[in-house]
Amino acid sequence: MEVVTVTETSTETDTGTCTGTYEVVVIGGGAAGLSAALVLGRSRRRTLVVDAGEPRNTPAAHMQGYLTRDGMSPAEFLALGREEIARYGVDLVRDRAVDVTKGEDESAGFAVALAGGETVHARRLVIATGLKDELPTVPGVAERFGRDVIHCPYCHGWEVRDQAFGVLATTPMSVHQALMVSQWSKDVTLFLHTVAESELADDDLRRLAAAGVAVIPGEVAELAVEDDRLTGVRLTDGTTHPREALFVAPRPVPQTGLLEKLGAELQETPFGAYPVVDPTGLTSVPGVWAVGNAMGFGEQVVNAASAGYRAGATINGELLMTDLDAVVRV
């Protein structure tokens, strides 16, 4: 197994080897997973991060709203995080966890199989696998996503303020998105796309009118792009409406495969099925925590980091008390 170790003073990586047994294995190397690993490393816990290298916010050039890191690129943020965990002896392997099994009892821990063929063992697991965004299948949306096709006004609204906004409706809930983004621009058009106007509640229509949001029925055919920038939204009837930024609502797809293999209880929400967790992220499977977007939709980077921190501190305390109780019982 190739393990990446990052020195405190360099962004270069060296490879080394390690044994396959850890106190905690963190699956996922985003903000939530790295934050959990940082706390655990500082708590002197032997910890491994398994990082498949597929952060959700890769399409975005910058991340916003994270105090002291506002405007930083997601790649730079994660590179700094990897440097920080390495200072405390945390290992990181560039690989994907493809299977996970639990022992016959809690003391037996967990076995994590990696795509590279190795298996590592842990007393506790942190699942930080996040979610994937399933975008509307309109030509141009995927290509522009994270640039001038965006989904979160708190993440990107300031950068496109006062521009001509479009909102691509995929469900009646898109009305809420159109109303929200009107805080950042007074030129907002809601393209109903696959939503019939009859599906909108009367109260929603009144709110849209009060906010000055224009409503245009008709299916969107494609985005108009010139000189590598969005210039408009083209309908199937051939009309093009000039727009500079388009808000969409991707369908979140929780990455719960490993949790399901462990038998974790999931609950259905309007945004997918997520694990049932306590306030620390502990799932229904003893010894397994879920953090960040692995435990719920809508976790911003700062929230995900907070969830990872909370889980890491909880796991350290839980391991300490478990070991002390074992001595007392003897």
Task: List the predicted regions and their residue ranges.
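Beta1-alpha1 glycine-rich phosphate/pyrophosphate-binding loop at the start
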Residues: E8, Y22-E76, A164, M173-S198
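Glycine-rich dinucleotide-binding loop and its adjacent helix/turn
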Residues: V6, K132-L179, W184
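Extreme N-terminal leader/targeting segments of oxidoreductases
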Residues: M1-Y22, A79, Y88
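N-terminal glycine-rich dinucleotide-binding loop that anchors FAD/FMN and/or NAD(P) in oxidoreductases
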Residues: R42, R46, A52-E54, A61-Y88, ...
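Residue-level detector of alpha-helix initiation sites
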Residues: G30-A31, D133, P172-M173, M295-G296
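A Rossmann-like FAD-binding core segment of flavoenzymes
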Residues: A79-L114, T119-A122, S185-A273, L320-V330
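FAD-site-proximal beta/loop scaffold in flavoenzymes
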Residues: T7, E143-E159, P252-V302, R310
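A conserved FAD-binding loop/helix module that cradles the flavin
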Residues: A37-L38, V175-L179, V291-V330
